[in-house]
Structure formats: C-alpha cells, structure tokens
Regions:
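N-terminal signal peptide c-region/cleavage motif recognized by signal peptidases
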Residues: 15-17
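Non-catalytic C-terminal accessory/binding modules of secreted extracellular proteins
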Residues: 153-154, 163, 170-190, 194-195, ...
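Acidic carboxylate motifs that coordinate Ca2+ or other divalent cations, activating on Asp/Glu
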Residues: 248-252, 327, 573-575, 579
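A domain-level signal for the mature, folded cores of soluble proteins
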Residues: 210-225, 310-319, 332, 336-414
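Active-site recognition of the HExxH zinc-binding catalytic motif
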Residues: 323-338, 423
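Active-site-proximal segments of metallohydrolase catalytic domains
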Residues: 123-134, 177-292
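N-terminal prosegments of processed precursors
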Residues: 19-129
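Alpha-helical segments with a strong preference for the paired helices of cellulosomal dockerin domains
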Residues: 258, 572-593
Length: 593
C-alpha cells in the first residue's frame, strides 16, 4: 500500500460521521507576523480544501502566519518556512516556491482530495442517532472552551454568547455583538412561527488540557480533527457545574447535542490549519452514566472580508455570525447539507439553493450575521408548516410571507409521492431584509424527506438535484462556478462573475428582476419538470401538466397573486378552460409564424 493510500485510509477510519459548513468564499485579509497584509481565498469544504492568494498560489495559514505551500509527490499540501506576501511584494524565494506548484502536482493534490471527498460524502443513515425535538423549548448545553495556547478574545464571553444565543434583542459589547440581526433563539422562533424556541445554557469558559493543534489537527487540506476528544474534555471540565441528564430532552437516556464554542477563529472561514472546522459529529459517546449523541462546534470570532478600522486594518475581533451556529444546530435537528459535495456536482449550475437555504450558502448571508431563515421545504420537514396542496385550477391565489402569517403551497406529482413543487413569498423585510431578491419563489423537491436524516446529500448527483429552486430567470448560478473577486477561477471551471451571481439570485423569484409573470413548460425553465426512470433505468424528464400564470407582486404590500392552471388539451391560452378564446390564441400563433 503506497503512502498516500495509507494516509487516506487512516483519515477515513478514524473520522467520525460529521456534517459541516461550506467554506466561506469571500476574500479574507490576514495580518502577517512581519506587519504586512495578505488577501487570501478559501476553497472546497471540510474534507478537501485549500487556500490561495490573488494569483492562485497555494498557501497554508497557520498559528504562526500564512506560508507559501509545497506539494509533495504524494499530493500532500504543507507549509514551507517562507512567509507569503501579495504577488507584487514577493521575494525571489517566494517566486521559486510558487513556481514549484506545477500543474501535475496540483492535479495530484486535487485527485487525492477527490478520493477523500468521495468517501467522506457518501450518504449514510446514522443508526441510533437522536435528533433534537422540533417543537417546544429544548435545553442545550453550550460550553465555552479556550485552548492551552489560545484564550478568548472577547472580554466576557459568557455575557456575549448568552446574548448571542438567547436574547430577544442584541446590543454591542465592543465586539460587534449587535452586528447579528437576531440571536440564535430568535432566528428559530421566527423560522418556526413561534413553535420552536430552544434554550441555551452557557457554561465556562474553561481551558482545555491541550493545544489548538491537538484538537484541530494540522492538515491544511483534509479533515483530521478530533471533535470527540474536544467534547469529552469540555464536558469533564464542567461536570461539577451541570447535570448532563438535564439535556436529554425526550427522556430516552441520551443527550441529543452538546455544543462547543471554542476560542479564536474557525478553519471554515479562514482560520489556521490547526483550528476546528465548524461541524456537528455523531459520536454516540458515553460520558459518566449518560450517552451523548452529537457534538457540535464553531468558533468565537469571525473577520468580515473588506471591513477595516479607521487605520485601514481588518477588523479581527467580531463575534462570529449566528449563521454558522444555526447551520450546525440544524444538523442536530436532522437537516442534511444541501450544497453539492462532489466535484462533478460543483461543476454545473441549477444544482442547489445557494443563498436560499441555511443548509447551503445562506448561512453566510451578510457574512453570516443575517442567515437565511428556514424555507418552505425546511419548515415542512420540521413540522412547522403543512403546505396547502393545489389540485385543481384556481384563480387569484394570494401568497403572503410566512413570517407575516402567510402559508406556502404545494404541487404534488401524482406518480411519485416524494416529488413536489413548493411555492412561497419572499419579501425583503424582517428576517429576509437581506435577501437578494423578492417575490414568489418556487422549489423543486424530489426527495423522500418524510423523516429527517442529516447523513443524506440530496444535491450530489450532477443534473438531478433533489432540493433546488426553479429560477424565474432560467439560471441559478452555483457559487462554485463563479470567479473570485479578483477574476481568478475557484477551480471548478466556472466563468460567472460575482455581479452575475448576485444578479442571478435576484432574478430567481417571480416576477423578479426579469418581470417573469408565468411558469409554463413552454419556457423550458430548469427544474420545472418531473423526473422518471426510462427503460434503461436512467433519469428522464416529463412535463408537469400544470402552469402558474398571471403572477403579480404588489410592490406596496408585498402580496403575490397567481393562477394555478391544470392544463387541458386545447386550452391554448392557459385560462383553465377550453372555449372560443383558444381559437383566437391559435390564430395568433399561426399569424406569428
């Protein structure tokens, strides 16, 4: 067995089933130990990630600084001893090291990463897992942990994170605590329509017996973290202050979740290679006489891209956005990651939900300080809403936002129970004030989700996403297919600019920026069809036999109205009936030829 295979096998055998946040893909400014500033970009996800400078040179961020990377003959990435600088400021030594990152070595690195990525991302049912209750006010233990070599930056972390997790309103304690739109509890209160208001008991801070590197590993490209040991050590340090059984919310003898907020930054948002990547892991660990099913973790701090102080230096002491916590906490409730986890599925557009879901890139909306609330599918899975099914032609349906007392609608595939379209109203106010677009948003669901399983990966099959958006403008650009802000590629072949990406999101709802007032088969909008298996067992599509027409949005009230049409043979004008008006439509079509 060669060395690469041995390393891969070791990682996969020791890794716990874990589900994590996407990599933060905006530019990150690092302060180097020599006083210089370096802008970097993070790529990939927990199982395979890398960091680059503006010209694509690979670097490794560590506790001691960010260094030019080396790639060895086994495709492993490691820091050199040479500190990295902006391309125009590089020394001759840096230039030589950058030149050694040849295309064959980069290809080997990504091939190695794809092997680990593929193994780590196979869907799995986590037998015996107990998810948090979806209603009421379950109690959750949150432990604040410092490392032997890193303390908290926030002066009073108990005060700050108790507010961050539980408060109705937020105020600034000098670490931008008020920068978050809502506390975590308030986020779920709003998302659930008042049906779910978790209570977080914050204890600590305690100092772990080992260093950051001991728990976070040292790999610059793969998952080598020890969240199980992190959680065990944290619980043992507070066991005299708490009764673990208080956090068994359904009385089955198992604590559903213990959450750790650790000092410093997280690797998912540009933290050093030794730091933890935000995640929830199924551990099924017995501590004392009580089992804990899941450990979760995220970082204390976040450094927003592009935001600088009055001296021009990046802010480095922002409290973390609630988006990361809400994403990981949602895993502990059973929701899966909805972003694509394979190289093939990242190379295509119209594959996912991007900013339209907390389980995709919506966790980083406004840098994570204004995460996307639960959408119609997520609410229905949690049992917070039962969408009203449309079965016959209905005119003048009024759609209001869920947070304002509205409801969503459902169109079901009579041939396949798990396939539906969901319809809701998104308005740029309240919890959705930071949304990219507004109007009627349509989701295509082809996923047997009557029971939750955080071990699924619904959007990993390129060309057949299971949970996605039907984009009014005909294009939902994948974030993996966008160029970075400096114009360079993310590594998946895409050429969309950041401006095009934002415009694509704004154009997803109806009528949207494109003024699209109908959704019919004739428009050939991606994802507006049903899936079936052809005679060869391959995916094929067929028309839905329904249409949404006369979609209008009242710009003052935000109400959306539309007609639901069950199509009939001869109903050429799609008004829900066959009559002489269809003859006029036919004549118009002929004359237009």
């Amino acid at each position: 067995m060669n060395r690469t295979l041995i390393i891969l096998t070791t990682i996969l055998l020791t890794a716990l089933p874990a589900w994590s946040s996407r990599a933060f893909r905006e530019p990150i400014t690092l302060s180097q130990p020599d006083g210089t500033q370096l802008t970097v970009w993070l790529h990939g996800d927990e199982s395979h990630h890398w960091m680059t400078t503006a010209d694509g040179t690979m670097v490794v961020n560590t506790q001691k600084g960010c260094f030019v990377a080396s790639i060895n003959e086994d495709g492993e990435l490691a820091p050199t001893t040479v500190l990295a600088h902006e391309p125009t400021l590089r020394t001759a030594a840096e230039q030589r090291l950058a030149a050694r990152q040849t295309e064959p070595l980069r290809t080997l690195f990504h091939k190695r990463g794809s092997q680990a990525e593929g193994s780590a991302r196979r869907a799995q049912v986590v037998e015996g897992n107990r998810y948090l209750p979806h209603t009421g006010s379950p109690r959750v233990l949150v432990i604040l942990t410092a490392y032997q070599d890193l303390d908290f930056t926030i002066p009073d972390p108990v005060k700050s994170f108790t507010q961050y997790l539980n408060s109705e309103t937020l105020e600034d304690y000098e670490n931008k605590e008020g920068f978050n739109d809502h506390s975590v509890r308030k986020y779920f209160d709003i998302s659930s329509g008042g049906q779910f208001t978790p209570q977080f008991d914050v204890v600590g801070p305690v100092t772990l017996p080992d260093s950051m590197k001991y728990y976070g590993g040292s790999s610059a490209y793969a998952n080598d973290e020890n969240i199980s040991k992190l959680g065990e050590d944290a619980i043992n340090l507070v066991k005299d202050k708490i009764d673990l059984k208080d956090y068994d919310n359904d009385g089955d003898g198992r604590v559903e979740l213990v959450y750790i907020i650790h000092a410093g930054y997280g690797q998912n948002a540009g933290g050093p290679a030794e730091s933890m990547w935000a995640k929830v892991a199924y551990v099924n660990r017995k501590i004392g006489d009580t089992y804990v099913n899941n450990f979760g973790c995220n970082a204390e701090l976040f450094s927003p891209s592009g935001l600088k102080d009055d001296k021009g230096f990046p802010y480095a002491k922002y409290i973390n956005g609630t988006g990361t916590f809400c994403h990981e906490f949602s895993h502990a409730m059973g929701l899966p990651d909805l972003y694509p986890n394979t190289t093939a599925s990242r190379r295509v557009d119209n594959q996912t939900l991007e900013h339209w879901s907390i389980m995709d890139y919506g966790l980083y909306r406004r840098n994570g300080f204004a995460p996307t609330p639960y959408n119609a599918w997520e609410r229905s899975v949690m049992g917070w809403e039962q969408p009203k099914e449309l079965t016959e032609t209905t005119k003048g349906i009024t759609l209001l936002p869920f947070a304002e007392g509205g409801k969503s609608y459902k169109i079901a595939n009579s041939k396949k129970s798990e396939e539906v379209f969901l319809i809701e109203n998104i308005q740029k106010r309240g919890v959705n004030a930071r949304a990219f677009g507004h109007g009627m948003l349509v989701y295509h669901i082809d996923y047997a989700s009557n029971t939750v399983n955080m071990g699924d990966y619904p959007n990993n099959t390129a060309g057949h996403p299971r949970v996605t958006v039907v984009p009014a403008d005909g294009l939902l650009i994948s974030g993996y297919q966008t160029l970075r802000s400096d114009g360079s590629s993310q590594g998946y072949g895409g050429t969309h600019t950041q401006a095009e990406y934002s415009a694509s999101l704004a154009g997803d709802p109806f009528p949207g920026t494109g003024g699209i007032t109908s959704l019919t088969a004739d428009q050939q909008i991606p994802s507006f069809y049903y899936y079936y298996k052809d005679d060869n067992g391959k995916d094929a599509t067929e028309q839905t036999g329904v249409a949404l027409t006369n979609i209008t949005e009242n710009t003052e009230t935000g109400a959306v109205t539309f007609d639901y049409i069950v199509e009939q043979l001869g109903d050429l004008n799609r008004d829900g009936k066959v009559d002489t008006a269809d003859i006029t439509t036919l004549v118009d079509l002929i004359l237009a030829q």
